Amino acid sequence: MLDGLEAVAQKGEGGPHDGRLALFSIADLTAIRNLIRGGSVIDWHRLYFADRDQVDRFLRVHEFDPERGPDMARLEALREQAVDYLERHLGFHIAEEVAERIPARDLLLVASQNGKRRTHACVVLKVMHVLQHLAGRELVNRLSVSADQIFRAVEDKVLRTVEEMKGAGCAIVEFEWSRKEPDSLITKLLAKRDNIAAHVYDKLRFRMITHSEDEIVFVLRELVQRLVPFNYVIPGESLNDIVDLDGFVERDPTLRRHLPQLLDLSTVAADKRTPVVNEFSGPSYRVVNFVADLPVRVDQLLNRPPGDDLFMDNGSVVFVLTEFQIVDARTAEANEIGENSHEGYKERQIMRVKARLAHGMKDEGERTPPLLDLTGRQDGDLGHD
């Protein structure tokens, strides 16, 4: 595999003058920024949609079909709940046109324009964002479906999207996905300082390898346009050692005009915190990694109409935490050498788990195995899981 990836990486296709750059909008760039920097849209002071087409694409990523009456009715209900919360609980006074007159769908455009209405639209949309997320979590608890069924629905959705992305010109040279096995999940929790199952975000993981570093940005654009709601990226959980988005934008005259708005967003909505590098990764391991709550429609999964009583209060969309890893071919090869390798990662993780579990045995007078038996072998050599 690695020889093939290296050959692909040396082809040099998809350079900075790729004609696809003309398709990038400021909405795309700000969404990509949120993916790779793990920000929270609650800190944003505006949106960046230019027209109804961009808005409708964003809604479809959230599993809202602008052509379906029940979906737009659900959007209106969320707006009504948001305004009620803001005025009743927080004492806000939302302008009538934002609270009622403007279609809820168009609030995304209003929040992208200048003027007083933008602030009101942003406030309402932020609460709608939270309400929809909470509703999706509540709906999961009411469903008579297994986690396996929902995971399978996510896998099918991502697989379809990746095929579409390839058809759109994305040079994805390798794609794989996995679910964390029970033993791996237990090991991860025992190794983590905060060993809470809710904090394990990679139960479902998708990994893509592109032919070049620049191609990663094109892949990210397609993801935010087709699959990943940038507003449901988990804040503070993104890691990016590869993509220099500002540099990517600055190198191209077509994109350079968007740089001031990107820098303004960086000032207003700074990163939530410095990402914590995985302590078990090798010293030069590089990756673009983020976690998002992916929306999945369950009315179709259950073969029920959107107006079914089951969906009356919480809609028909649930969310599934999903991890994405994206690297270019050359980096993928470097990540498998020496200390960066997956085998090395697992060795360090296993050693930590065994050391934590055996901690205190000596103080209690118990006989401690050689080297705390950290290796799983009696001769002290490192063993692989």
Can you name each region flagged by the protein language model?
Residues 202-211, 324:
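Short cationic amphipathic helices and targeting signals
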